[in-house]
Design a protein with these regions (language model features):
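N-terminal juxtamembrane cytosolic/stromal segments of multi-pass membrane proteins
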Residues: 1-49
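Selective transmembrane helix interface/packing segments
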Residues: 2-9, 13-16, 30, 61, ...
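Generic alpha-helix structural propensity
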Residues: 17, 46, 50, 74-77, ...
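Helix-boundary and loop/linker segments of multi-pass membrane transporters
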Residues: 28-32, 66-71, 164
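Alpha-helical transmembrane segments of integral membrane proteins
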Residues: 36-45, 72, 76, 80-84, ...
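Alpha-helical transmembrane spans of integral membrane proteins, capturing the lipid-embedded, hydrophobic core
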Residues: 42-50, 54, 81-90, 116-120, ...
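Membrane-helix interface segments in multi-pass membrane proteins
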Residues: 52-85, 126-148, 184-192
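Hydrophobic alpha-helical transmembrane segments and adjacent short intramembrane/lumenal linkers
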Residues: 93-180
Length: 192
């Protein structure tokens, strides 16, 4: 367990650093110190994403709005985002651990949890731009694709800088993941 307290100002600074300068952030990121801090980060990112999704549902601007349950759907989206962020933190860390071991990087679970939590800064951004699907499905898909590719760029920097993975292997893995995301998007648009 970590004896330190959570500093919200440091959280905001680190969130900005991850988005603006991921290479620098991940090269100086702490990979130890307990799981409490990354868990708090994940919950905050999930709560912000949930609040935005809730707002879009209240204003009828989200991809899924109204219907039989009305505003209750928005509350469930909020709660679901928070629970999803906690579950996603640990599942994402396990997936990242496997990717890191393939790329000859760190196999320390805590370090992988910390990188995963840092990459979850994308959640509120994705939720914010989720309203684009309300106006135009294709625009929303393209924006979602761009956000996903940027998230993979963050993941690449986390692998190479914080987890000390092999750069070339990490590039190949990220290219494969980008190709999978693009294919899934193309097939999902094609089914409309």
């Amino acid at each position: 367990m970590s004896d330190s307290t959570f500093d919200f100002n440091v959280f905001i600074k680190e969130s900005k650093d991850v988005l603006v300068n991921p290479k620098s952030y991940f090269s100086t990121m702490k990979t130890t110190g307990g799981i409490a801090e990354p868990l708090i980060k994940a919950v905050i990112y999930g709560a912000i994403a949930g609040a935005l999704a809730f707002l879009w549902s209240i204003l009828n601007l989200g991809a899924i709005t109204g219907g039989l349950f009305g505003g209750a759907l928005g509350i469930m989206i909020f709660i679901g985002k928070i629970i999803g962020s906690i579950i996603g933190l640990f599942i994402g860390a396990v997936i990242l651990l496997v990717i890191s071991s393939i790329c000859k990087g760190s196999t320390d679970f805590e370090a992988n949890v910390r990188v995963t939590a840092a990459c979850m800064v994308i959640m509120p951004i994705s939720a914010f731009f989720g309203l684009a699907s309300h106006f135009n499905y294709y625009l929303g898909s393209i924006i979602g694709l761009a956000i996903s590719v940027y998230g993979l760029w963050l993941l690449y920097n986390g692998l190479v800088e914080a987890l000390k993975a092999n750069k070339e292997t990490a590039k190949i893995v990220i290219y494969i993941l980008i190709a999978l995301i693009v294919l899934i998007m193309i097939f999902s648009i094609g089914t409309l």
